[in-house]
Amino acid sequence: MDIRISVQIFRSGETTSLWGRSNELGEDGVGGTLTGELEVGEVVSMELSLPLAAYPLKLRALVRYRIGLRHGFEFLAINEQQRDVLQRVCEMLATGTK
């Protein structure tokens, strides 16, 4: 699966927007390649365009790792509706159904 990611980070009084793609998704986080670099430990706002979701999923996430432009994120404070969408998408990926 190819997921579009949009990330916003607030630094030095300015909001910076990055975008990218991912093919790694779990119930607790996502990995992807972005158009710029983030630092490990930064908290970002992100939007994920997922199948089974009528609108992009808006989440807060913590940067857990970075290798070049490749980043790993851990989702923070997920509500029940967001958790349900993530679970359904992950189940769909595990079974190979659409």
Place the predicted regions along the sequence by residue.
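Structured alpha-helical
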Residues: M1-K98
